[in-house]
Each structure stands twice: as C-alpha cells, then as structure tokens.
Amino acid sequence: MATRRALKAVLVDLSGTLHIEDAAVPGAQEALKRLRATSVMVRFVTNTTKESKQDLLERLKKLEFDISEDEIFTSLTAARNLVEQKQVRPMLLVDDRALPDFKGIQTSDPNAVVIGLAPEHFHYQILNQAFRLLLDGAPLIAIHKARYYKRKDGLALGPGPFVTALEYATDTKATVVGKPEKTFFLEALRGTGCEPEETVMIGDDCRDDVGGAQNAGMRGILVKTGKYRAADEDKINPAPYLTCESFPHAVDHILQHLL
C-alpha cells in the first residue's frame, strides 16, 4: 500500500452505514457533525440503484443528515457517464425510482443492457430479453455486483447474482461501474484535490466498500452495521485498516488517531 499522508478526505457509504431504509444508524447524525467540524473533506458514495439521487437525498434529509446533492457520488451517475461515453441506447434493468437519473438517455431500440437492482423486473421474460440482446453483441453494463444488501426485514439478494447469470448464459463479462471498481473511488475524489493515500473509506461491505477502497490506495474502515456478518473482515486481503461497531465509532477513531 502507498505511503500514508495526512488525512484529507473521508468517503462514507450510505445504506447500511448511515441508515437502513428509513432508520438512521444510532448516533450517526451527531457523528457526521463531529466529522464535519474537522478540516477533512467528506463525500458520500453509494451503490444504491433502488432510487434516484434526488429521492435518496430526500430520504437522508428526513433522517436529519446534513448532506448536499453535490457531495453524493452514486453508481447510477457512473453508469450514466459510461452510457453517454459509449453512445449506446440501453435497456434499463433498474428500479423505476432510479429512472430519473437516466432522463434524456435514448432507450428505444436498445443496443446495450444496463442492470442494477430491479426486483420488480427480475423475471424470466425481461431477463430473456436482455439475454437475447447480449447474444446479439450488446455490451452488459452492471451498476454493481453486490451479492446482497440489508433491508429492515433482513438480508436480500443484490443485483450480483442476476448479473452473473447473464454473464454465464451469454459467455460475456459485464463492465462494472460501481464499488468496488477502482475507477469509481477515483471518480468520487475527482475535483476534491485529495489523493487516495490521503483518504479513508467507511462502509459495511467488506468487499465493495473496504476491499475496493484499499485496492485504490485508501484506508478502509469496516463497520458492523447493515449487511455486516461475523468474520467478514477475514474475507479480504489485506484486512481492513480497522473494524469497529458503527459509524460513530469510526469517527471516534479518526478524530483520535488520524487527525
């Protein structure tokens, strides 16, 4: 891992780290205020594909988090950027609530497949339509490949198993744009003036949050909330820089040891 420099930026995951659906992680709002009172730059990074950035922001505001839209970098944004770069017409396999983030993108007569978490659309007919497009040479763009995520009623399948099914059936590989891709973390830092070696990532997903960030040159703090399961910290190499109980504990560590 690269030589450490003074901490300048903290990237924070949202779902599972600051909140679970419409409930905040206890103490998270106050911890965020304490972090903001320091000199570090705070940005929020999320793989959520269940809602648009605007809907997500409204949810966070209702939970009394002091967060602005320009501080959030989502995998939906990364997917839209790639679609525009490739100049393709995507079949959008995403939740209807995420569609506003693709406003203005041409989707008729699709020649690409973009897939996120879309429980209402993950049925045979729709997946078979995507399968046929891919067989005809359409690129497969995965917003992310998370295995599962945390809901109020327990763990639930993420888009990863469905992306993998399409890859398997068509003998192709998806281009993944969200966490844990290195480019996602670097894009999140773009315009901040901060380098990965000056950054800490806090999240509840050992692979996508912590492993991805550490592969990009950051330090990763794994929190035991959200989708965390016992011994997750042993699933990645190198191990997390730190594993702690929750976001407030992560902030305590940063304030006491990294500033």
Curated annotation (Swiss-Prot):
GO terms for cellular component: cytoplasm. SUPFAM superfamilies: HAD-like. Binds 1 Mg(2+) ion per subunit. It comes from the Eukaryota. Substrate binds at D13, L14, S15, T46, N47, K179. GO terms for molecular function: enzyme binding; metal ion binding; phosphatase activity. Its cofactor is Mg(2+). Mg(2+) binds at D13, S15, D204. Gene3D superfamilies: HAD superfamily/HAD-like. Keywords: Coiled coil, Magnesium, Metal-binding. The modification N6-succinyllysine is found at K50. InterPro entries: HAD-like_sf, HAD-SF_hydro_IIA, HAD_sf, LHPP/HDHD2. Pfam families: Hydrolase_6, Hydrolase_like. Residues 47-71 form a coiled coil. Belongs to the HAD-like hydrolase superfamily. This is Haloacid dehalogenase-like hydrolase domain-containing protein 2.
